[in-house]
Amino acid sequence: ISSQSYCSFDPLIFDEYDLKTYNRGRQQQTMNYTYYYIKDALDVCDIDVVVLEVFGMFYEEDDTGFISEGVRDSSLNDMRMSETKIEAIRECVPEEMQISYFFPLDKYHFRWEELDYASWNGFYNSALKPYYEEADRGYKRWTESEVCVDDYWSIAFSEIRRDVYAGNIKYLDKIYELCQKKGAKLILVKAPLPCYDRVIEETNTVSDWAEEHDIELINYMRLQDVLELNFYTDSLDGGTHLNESGAGKVSKHLAAYLKENYFE
């Protein structure tokens, strides 16, 4: 869950395998918000498998994702109003700012004259419907491409480990326990991009956690050949995110794998 999720997994392709999915990634989404997004989904849906893209594990304690108002807004404003959202606000938002997330009109009162039907309809959807309605069920369908010139393949198999922020491990533990309680299978995935030293080394550390908890981690950084990724055409921005072409390759592989191993 993060922009890596909404750039990598296309629910329409999963539909072709009779797998009904929803992509709940948000920009720079940190693991604390991710936990509450998963909790919210499990509260209202009967979910068999939770696929967690692990890039959110690599944010450090002082990264902007933990303190940015923009990240808070994109993570919380699209959550339906519920006990889980209230818990998320109390846990993730500084106390002096919480009122504006409990009552959004407090935050936006100065622009009340600009409110129109779309504003109220959006509030209705987020507050009263189980899921906020989005085109492509949360996936971002970007077709632009920028050539990726770095040789990622040569370093993807490094076995070096790097410490992961303990707060992220805490929420990964909570996600694991929540899925166990709800009877949902947790599967970890690392998208093929980005793929550089720090990400590879921290993915190895998360892989150790997964092995200790008997959880599968599919590391697509090491499956670039299987996916037949083309770094001239499959990256949106020169090596950080996939575009529609690259996401199609990942989605087809993951959907086929899930279908064969968990839904036959």
Q: Residue locations for each model-derived region?
A:
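Active-site-proximal beta-strand/loop segments in catalytic clefts of secreted hydrolases
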Residues: 1-3, 24-27, 53-55, 189-193, ...
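Membrane-embedded segments
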Residues: 4-87
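Loop/turn elements at helix/coil->beta-strand transitions in domains of secreted/extracellular proteins
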Residues: 17-20, 46-49, 180-187, 213-216
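Acidic/histidine-rich helix-loop elements
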Residues: 21-28, 160-164, 239
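Acidic-and-aromatic substrate-binding clefts and catalytic sites of carbohydrate-active enzymes
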Residues: 28-32, 162-168, 194-202
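Alpha-helical scaffolding within the catalytic cores
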Residues: 36-39, 169-175, 201-204
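Secreted/periplasmic serine-hydrolase-like ester/acetyl group-modifying domain
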Residues: 68-182
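C-terminal regions of proteins
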Residues: 200-264
